[in-house]
């Protein structure tokens, strides 16, 4: 039986509440500010009570306000972010799944060397890789394209490692039984590995889709055309260095709309996400 200690429980709950406040307050203030005019937002002291411009601000931002500021519609920014997030998440999962499958279940020369070469890339900072990657994208003419935005970000050493570790837990008897039943490698992968890996795939999809949605540095480098901007780049370009000339109400509305999709992904896939992180199905 776990001993109940009221003081420890109280301290633990206070720490949790403090953490929630620290995380939630910026989101709350962003929402509150999205209901105010730009003048009200920059006028001190900061109001923590919601304004009365909900319909006006959101209607204007969605139907032309953002486009007047950054030269591209809010819908286009959200669509670009959606395409980038889905392409990166799905691409990373497919490539990592296939790579781990080959490393674990195929016997070929230097397979562990190739695995460690993939794994070592985790030790390389983004800044080290980004310049040669950018040079390749420029030479291939992929600036201002979805391919340029997504292809360089599809390889994932982390996902490959996680899939490899999971595949190593597959009983050898299961592999041997599939071989006796004349199941080829791709049938084994499709009929056995994919069903067993569904919770791991779901957990990785949540993490990787949010990773793709929140990309800033790479889209900033490879997009010159405003029509290829993601929502994060659009937000940055909406903010002028002079506060008085920034439409802060549109900025706050855009920020709220930008965080809704990741929240929906986490909420809708929460059960699969937790299950994929803490359980192993076999």
UniProtKB/Swiss-Prot annotation:
Residue ranges constituting the ABC transmembrane type-1 domain according to the UniProt record: 78-269
Endpoints of the signal sequence: none
Record InterPro entries: MetI-like, MetI-like_sf
Membrane topology per record: Multi-pass membrane protein
Intrachain S-S bonds: none
Residue spans crossing the bilayer: 14-34, 86-106, 112-132, 146-168, 201-221, 248-268
UniProt key word Transport: yes
GO CC list: plasma membrane
Name of a matching Pfam family: BPD_transp_1
GO BP annotations, alphabetical order: transmembrane transport
CDD domains named in the record: TM_PBP2
Quaternary assembly: The complex is composed of two ATP-binding proteins (UgpC), two transmembrane proteins (UgpA and UgpE) and a solute-binding protein (UgpB).
Family assignment from sequence similarity: Belongs to the binding-protein-dependent transport system permease family.
Function as written in the Swiss-Prot or TrEMBL entry: Part of the ABC transporter complex UgpBAEC involved in sn-glycerol-3-phosphate (G3P) import. Probably responsible for the translocation of the substrate across the membrane.
Official protein name in the record: sn-glycerol-3-phosphate transport system permease protein UgpE
Organism: Brucella suis biovar 1 (strain 1330)
Chain's gene name: ugpE
């Amino acid at each position: 039986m776990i001993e109940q200690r009221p003081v420890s429980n109280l301290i633990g709950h206070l720490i949790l509440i403090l953490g929630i406040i620290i995380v939630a307050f910026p989101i709350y203030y962003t929402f509150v500010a999205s209901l105010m005019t730009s003048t009200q937002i920059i006028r001190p002291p900061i109001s923590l009570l919601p304004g009365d411009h909900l319909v006006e601000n959101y209607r204007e931002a969605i139907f032309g306000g953002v486009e007047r500021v950054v030269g591209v519609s809010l819908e286009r920014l959200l669509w670009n972010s959606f395409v980038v997030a889905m392409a990166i998440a799905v691409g990373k999962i497919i490539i990592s799944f296939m790579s781990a499958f080959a490393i674990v279940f195929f016997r070929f020369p230097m397979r562990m060397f190739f695995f460690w070469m993939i794994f070592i890339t985790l030790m390389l900072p983004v800044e080290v890789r980004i310049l040669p990657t950018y040079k390749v994208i420029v030479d291939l003419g992929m600036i201002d394209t979805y391919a340029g935005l997504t292809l360089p970000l599809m390889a994932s050493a982390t996902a490959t490692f996680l899939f490899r570790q999971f595949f190593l837990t597959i009983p050898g008897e299961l592999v041997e039984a599939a071989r006796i039943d004349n199941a080829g490698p791709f049938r084994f992968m499709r009929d056995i590995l994919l069903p067993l890996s569904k919770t791991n795939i779901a957990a990785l999809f949540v993490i990787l889709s949010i990773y793709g949605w929140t990309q800033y540095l790479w889209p900033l480098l490879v997009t010159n055309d405003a029509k290829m901007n993601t929502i994060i780049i659009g937000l940055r370009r909406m903010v002028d260095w002079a506060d008085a000339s920034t439409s802060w109400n549109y900025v706050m509305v855009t920020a709220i709309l930008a965080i809704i999709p990741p929240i929906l992904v986490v909420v809708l896939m929460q059960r699969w996400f937790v299950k994929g992180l803490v359980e192993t199905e076999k």
